[in-house]
Amino acid sequence: MSVSQIFSIPLDDAAANHLKNFNIPSISLPNQEGNYLRLDRSDTFRMIIYFFPMTGRPDMPLPENWNKIPGANGCTLQTCKFRDNYDDLIGLNAVPIGISTQSVNYSKEMTNRLRVPFDVLSDEKLELKNALSLPTFLVEDKIYLKRLTLIVDEKIVKKVFYPINLIDKHIDDVLKWLKEN
């Protein structure tokens, strides 16, 4: 049994179909240190922006029935997969950036605990979610982003991975696409 098989599989609700060839808006979000990062920048690196609902913390309970929500579980695993393949991604001229609706402090704790070498941004005010019309779900009166990944080159979304069904294999799909494009 793969790791992904223990998680509820999300259905394709077509909520991200509009994102391919979308121009990244001129929005800056705070990273885990509270420093703002512009997402519409022109870099030599492609950006792999992966959106996730939330990472759990050892000292805090998950929202009630979290494990029953399709696509909710697996954010720590996904982040660790990007972390473990960071050098390969950089070698393919791509830099990962994680984004959730969690606070800067929450992101800081997670990046320190998991030793994440890249930026994890907070869209706590839902600026990017609203600008891109990102798919979300609601739990206990809080909005969470659904898991998806965008590959951005020259401010334009070139590839959309959504829904992400096999979390433990997703990094392989990203690496394959980067090698072929």
Can you say where each PLM-predicted feature lies in the sequence?
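Chalcogenol-based redox active-site neighborhoods
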Residues: M1-N181
